[in-house]
Amino acid sequence: MAEMADKAKVEEMDWEGIDGVRMTWNLWPRTKVEASKCVIPLAASISPIRRHPLILDLPYAPLDCKTCKALLNAFARVDFAAMNWVCPFCYHRNHFPSHYHSISEINLPGELYPQYTTVEYTLPPDPSRVPPPPVFVFVLDTCMIEEELGYAKSALKQAIGLLPENALVGFVSFGTQAHVHELGFSEMSKVFVFKGNKEVTKDQILDQLGLGSSSRRAPTSGFSKGAQNGFQSSGVDRFLLPASECEYTLDLLLDELQSDQWPVQPGHRPQRCTGVALSVAAGLLGACLPGTGARIVALVGGPCTEGPGTIISKDLSDPVRSHKDLDKDAAPYYKKAVKFYDSIAKQLVAQGHVLDLFASALDQVGVAEMKVAVESTGGLVVLSESFGHSVFKDSFKRMFEDGEHSLGLCFNGTLEINCSKDIKIQGVIGPCSSLEKKGPNVADTVIGEGNTSAWKLCGLDKSTCLTVFFDLSSTGSTAPGALNQQLYLQFITRYQNSEGKSLARVTTLTRQWVDTAVSTENLVQGFDQETAAVVMARLTSLKMETEEGFDATRWLDRTLIRLCSKFGEYRKDDPTSFTLKPYLTLFPQFMFNLRRSQFVQVFNNSPDETAYFRMLLNRENISNAIVMIQPSLTSYSFNSGPQAALLDVASIAADKILLLDAYFSVVVFHGMTISQWRNMGYHHQPEHEAFAQLLQAPQEDSQMLVRERFPVPRLVVCDQHGSQARFLLAKLNPSATYNNANEMSAGSDIIFTDDVSLQVFIEHLQKLAVQS
């Protein structure tokens, strides 16, 4: 358990470096059979456009291999005399073009410097095309009480004020019906109304909006804001206007907008047509700006009860589906709604557009059903209890902010992966969609978005992360690495930034093959236990969603026992002799906390909350994702500065303040004595300045966490034995429970649970790992 306190030191290091890549294994076994014995899959967590000061910017287009299309990189063998280079992936010899004629061993182009394994190319702009501005269509739910709608409208006004002046803005409101507002019609408020109780096709949407083939007007001269065909400009003129031109109109429109006026019968839910509204927004963007970076930003305040995407009946006596209902197939609307949002996802991916979801309600709104559309398009998701809550307000503002805390929103991306012969790609877990590009490096077995070596990333930002799973195709007789000891992987991300520039980020990595049939000693030295824990969490979540009757706890336990049995050091049938190398010592406690986490123990949460947690787990980097699995705990006391503390109930003391970072929530917990002194006002007295500073330190640190994170976490400030202390206690190792309360020290605490403690878990693990 002492290793828990060492974790803070590990977090201080920049594990991802310039490349933004972390792997479960940094040394690879040579055969498929040996890879299967590694227990933890061969996987890489990649942050395709993560910012780093050492990444080289190159103002020209990259060179590609004529055979395999891999791009020129620092691992290519270059013959300067013959002016050619050998591709490390397929060994094909390529000639340099004439504009590379001046290169030499002392005059290398940036992509050939050995330290620049990641470079970013700024692709030359197309002179015939104006760089497209970013596009935002806001979709606002009006089936809310006036107070909630007021909060949402205020947030929208603030967001529009933060947009770049050239950003195009559209607006759709919905309740019982969906309303498309023609912002370009300045004489009066002009609205196109769509019935909310039935599905509308793309053609019906276009015809009703006057954008169909029968009603297309001639193009207006000189207007080409991202429109690919001339006729589309009329739709842009009418429904999508630059923020600078429509800010005043939208302000007036929002001021006049009221809660949905359709009468709601007593004991019934409002008639809310979320599905139709999103269909209409997608159809509008598809008609006006296909293939251009655009986002649908939906603010939803309750469950869809009308038309496609319905998740619950209007009768309030019917509860919204729970995990038990989904398990028993007793959620009558669920599968149909998922199928509908899957069709929206496919449409948006084909158009290159993003769906962002801000769901704010005490009830569920249907995040579980919409997950496929948000995740496939790389959209952002924020779940909160109210549009007046800081989780929504601060997160929504962050989405549009510039500067240091900007999310770095980018559009229209693709990811391609090249790898050495005999390495196969099984698939990707994360915010992307398969482009179904077949090839020799595509595996037969599929994990997540598979059967491809290229993916669409409609929306991505500086923190977007994807997990790529690999397999080996070789058998013992044709083992890779027999001739070449190095393997190579290349990740190519092409995307459009917020200014409309086209960029290509290229990361090329090498790792070493090792012969694990002889010894596993070297292999273990390349094990990244944090990455392995996160990959296991993502894989477990995927299996729980896709495999019927999957027992997550049992599968994780068996995996951990096999890993410890394979790589632990012990005498057969002697648990006391069991030890793990330093590269593995943290992994069992990560698995212990994963078993107890919201990703596995889903029955404490709603399906919406589980979908939300999993979407963020799948898109965040390893450092953030590991905090979701195993929160970090910091202790503050008079005797010392902030110190990393064990994630254990034993860390609670009457004279300490604890700061828990559980990613989705940040908890400041005051010990009993501290809270009593604070309530007596000691911190206001000059002679107790040290106490005032002690109270202030965790508050400042918690605010820093809140400022740096998206979505903004929930901040909980509580006292020992107070009602909200549960937010801390639920995350701590229950080493002291009501069963052994007599062993407690004064001022500490107990947890009322029958869950096993980490110590008991490790004892059982040792016993099972050493069995003959």
From Swiss-Prot:
This is Protein transport protein SEC23 F. Keywords: Cytoplasmic vesicle, Endoplasmic reticulum, ER-Golgi transport, Membrane, Metal-binding, Protein transport, Transport, Zinc. Pfam families: Gelsolin, Sec23_BS, Sec23_helical, Sec23_trunk, zf-Sec23_Sec24. The keyword Transmembrane helix does not apply. It comes from Arabidopsis thaliana (Mouse-ear cress). GO terms for biological process: COPII-coated vesicle budding; intracellular protein transport. It is found in: Cytoplasmic vesicle, COPII-coated vesicle membrane; Endoplasmic reticulum membrane; Membrane. Its main location: membrane. It comes from the Eukaryota. Residues 65-90 are annotated as: Zinc finger-like. InterPro entries: ADF-H/Gelsolin-like_dom_sf (IPR029006), Gelsolin-like_dom (IPR007123), Gelsolin-like_dom_sf (IPR036180), Sec23 (IPR037364), Sec23/24_helical_dom (IPR006900), Sec23/24_helical_dom_sf (IPR036175), Sec23/24_trunk_dom (IPR006896), Sec23_24_beta_S (IPR012990). Belongs to the SEC23/SEC24 family. SEC23 subfamily. One of its GO terms (molecular function) is zinc ion binding. Component of the coat protein complex II (COPII), composed of at least five proteins: the Sec23/24 complex, the Sec13/31 complex and Sar1. Interacts with SEC24A. It is a peripheral membrane protein. One of its GO terms (cellular component) is endoplasmic reticulum membrane. Zn(2+) binds at residues 65, 68, 87, 90. The lineage of its organism: Eukaryota, Viridiplantae, Streptophyta, Embryophyta, Tracheophyta. Component of the coat protein complex II (COPII) which promotes the formation of transport vesicles from the endoplasmic reticulum (ER). The coat has two main functions, the physical deformation of the endoplasmic reticulum membrane into vesicles and the selection of cargo molecules.
